[in-house]
Amino acid sequence: MLSPMAKDEDSTAAPFDRVENTGSQSQSQSHSQSQSQTESHSHSQPQSHSHSRSHARSHSQSQAFSHFGSAVTPAASSTWGLGEPTPSHHLSSEASTSPAESWRLDEFVTDPGYLAYQEELRCLIFNTAQTAAPTREGTPEAADGGFSAGGFAAPGTILGDEGAARRQAGQILGTGRRLEYLKNYVGEVATWLDMFDSDRAFGIQVPVLARSSPALLYAVLALSARQMERKEGKQTSFDSLELYQEAIRLLTPLLQSRDQKIIPICTILCCLEMMSASAQDWRKHLEGCAALFESFYVHGFSGGLLQAVFWCYARMDLCGALISDGTESTLLTPSKWLPNGASHNEASELFHQSGTPDMHANYAVYLCAKVCELVADRTRYFELGDASGCSSPDELTDRWIRLWEDLQAWTRDRPPELLPVQSIQSSPFPQILFLHWAAISSNQLYHTACTLLLGSMPRPLNLKLGGVTGSAIWHAKCICGISLANPHQGCLNNAIQPLWVAGRLLSHKSEHALLVKLIRSIEAVTGWGTCWRIDDLEAAWGYKVRKELRIADMVR
């Protein structure tokens, strides 16, 4: 239960009731930078909303935040101390020599063929979404798309003879590096698609289905090839482009048939597009998938493969909301992540009913999306005078309190699989080690959601938030520490936006240097374009971090 708290925040009081809270939590208050400086330098807003952002910035900070708190500002140098990075920080060690050192528009993204096929796919998807929707939500069996009952190529389906399709798959894999791409997909790419799915739908079920679906197989190969090209720093001659185009060619008749089996294929192709997309284009690539999920009534509780595909999409949609920096919610509103007719008040029970660590982790994704929705509604209400997302400041306050309580209940009710196996005080960030894949990102999203909520705390409401739990700096350090201690590729991909949220609050140069090296390393290791966020962070910090700067240099 929340209770009034004293004016000055005591970040060392009442230890957080989990093992993460083992380090020093005090923070000094000097050298803080204003949020207005942070926001004015951000380069990450989608272009379609540049007008609203400009309009919002024209309001003074005091006017915009007078009723509903203020943005979290970068805090001062922490008393966590300095020192050499521990072995768990190895991700950043090779950043300065990475072939993918900064995000660039390579020839894949600018190729006229890619752009033409991308637009064709987008139009086909929207046409399918507009004409495919049933008159009511289907049964759970129908919602799974019939994957478990016959896969993509059962006799009599639109793909024809299953044996012929499998022979075609063998011919496809016999060309060039395609078998290598399939191995890379199973061993590397699928692990981050399956990050919140212990049943490994993308790693096991999708490759099995791809044997009888050339369109799905080409989509898998295209995504894997693109990831390898990004890691290798290729600038020309892309196998992924040919594979992408062939996947769309084969997908076209499936889209025209308005079959739910198109959804995994479209989501995988969306992942490929997102891997190289600029921040301005992020949401554009998600819009088609959002329309398909909505029109086919696929949600986070559909069951089977489609449920796994939905949560893969949902994590990308959440990243898009985080990129918008408080101006946008997710494309698919969080209410549509739940079964038809379910309300937010029922969400906790729905997620808990599954009794699995995966769904508890997905609950963290949902709660973070709800926080983004609240922050976006708050921005529109106070900065733009748009009351479409809420009716009054009191409603925003009630939603804020409810979400804060939901987040604390989430961390309190974590199953053993989502708890850290070790948490060690270290400098400049704590080391928080998890064993379960889903534990890594879900705990990081919990800290991200708390950071965002603390940055939009209602005023003049004073709440006792429970020691370090009420410290945005503590949450920011945990976000960074989790990524440094847990080098799972899927979790690193999903960490970029949380690291941006956290990084703006860091003030010491040792923290900045380590975070920049980490972000460079993530791009080099995973192939995802990430380094554009370094420019945003450096703009927020007010200086450029030298690539050769070492933590040891800061100690002197």
Model-derived features: where do they sit?
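Intrinsically disordered, low-complexity activation-like regions
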Residues: M1-P253, S257, Q280-R556
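Internal, conserved structured core segments that host functional sites
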Residues: C266-D281
